[in-house]
Every structure is written in C-alpha cells, then in structure tokens.
Amino acid sequence: MKVLHLDSGIFLEQSVSRQVSQNIVNKLKEKQDITLFHRDLVANPVPHLAADELLAEEKPLIDELVQELLDADTLVIGAPMYNFTIPTQLKAWFDRVLQAGVTFKYTEQGPQGLVNGKKVYIASGRGGIYSQGEAQAMDHQESYLKQVLAFIGITDVTIIRAEGMNMGDEPRQQGFKEAEQEIETI
C-alpha cells in the first residue's frame, strides 16, 4: 500500500497533529507493508497562489504534487486547527492539487471528482473543543477538509481528533487518550 503523509503543523516536534499523524502511520505500518512518502508542508512549503506563479514554471511542481496524490492508496493528513481552519501551508497544497481535468472535471450536472478509491486519515489537533456544543459552528477545519476531499472524489475520510490541547493538563491527556483509542481501531 502506498501512503502519502502530509504534515502542516508549524510547531514541528511540539505539534499535536504531527504526533497523531505519525501514530496513524505507525499503526498502518503494523498492519501491513507500506511504501511511505512524507511531505512536510512547513519544512518544504508549497508556494501560495499568485498570478505570476500560474505560469509555465509552476507546472512541474503541480504535476509532482498531483502525481503523489494519484499514486497514493491512502493519505494521512496532519491538519491542526489554526484560527478555526487549516494552516495556509495545507491550503496551498490543496490549491495546487485541485486541477480541472485531472483531479476533478466539470460536467453538465456540476463538478465531478476524479480521485476515487482512496482512504484518508486526518489527524486533527485543536487547542479547544470544537466537535460539539456552540463552538462547533466555528469549525471551518474539518468541514473544509471533508468538502474539498469530496470535491475531488475522496469520501472515505476518518478524522482522528485530539481536542482540548490548550485547556490544561487533564483535557490534554484526555484528548490524546481519545485520539490513541481511535488509532487502535484502524
């Protein structure tokens, strides 16, 4: 199985999403042989969209990123919540891999995803608790990820969430415990 592992947590070793995404990869390795490709979107950022970058010199990078996506059977995405959404580094990656005619196409019925049959695990790290209650309305992280993945045809998405990371020691430990319990079910 080919696994594309994306990390976008800016806090590197202290990043909750990096820790959880690595634990997901480790669990996948326990279960079967995998070929792993790791792309660190912080250490090696994908440039943000700009008019000048949409010229021909960007095509090799776009082709490389799209091919990594297409080659993978499984994606593991380390996606922390920053200001209620995903990091700009991860958004820049999506901006490059959403390519009309390659990862989706327009039809008379609307857009149709072309990246089918893949499994995605999202390692979601959050300082607060946004999966329930009034704060759920502020979650533009997981909802965005599910929608953008569905747009390109990927609907088999499992979110492994570590919440409450900045709410004190007890909620932090509970958040990690719940994430680890979810990982054990993979």
From Swiss-Prot:
Enzyme nomenclature, EC number: 1.6.5.-, 1.7.1.17
Catalytic activity line of the entry: 2 a quinone + NADH + H(+) = 2 a 1,4-benzosemiquinone + NAD(+); N,N-dimethyl-1,4-phenylenediamine + anthranilate + 2 NAD(+) = 2-(4-dimethylaminophenyl)diazenylbenzoate + 2 NADH + 2 H(+)
InterPro entries associated with the record: Flavodoxin_fold, Flavoprotein-like_sf, FMN-dep_NADH:Q_OxRdtase_AzoR1, NADH:quinone_OxRdtase_FMN_depd
Note on cofactor: Binds 1 FMN per subunit.
Top-rank taxon: Bacteria
Cofactor(s) needed by this chain: FMN
Keywords of the record: Flavoprotein, FMN, NAD, Oxidoreductase
Pfam families in the record: Flavodoxin_2
Annotated FMN binding sites: 15-17, 81-84
One function term, GO molecular function aspect: FMN binding
Flavoprotein found in the keyword field: yes
Subunit structure of this chain's protein: Homodimer.
Protein function: Quinone reductase that provides resistance to thiol-specific stress caused by electrophilic quinones.
Family: Belongs to the azoreductase type 1 family.
PANTHER family, per the entry: FMN-DEPENDENT NADH-AZOREDUCTASE 1, FMN-DEPENDENT NADH:QUINONE OXIDOREDUCTASE
Protein name as annotated: FMN-dependent NADH:quinone oxidoreductase 1
Gene this chain is encoded by: azoR1
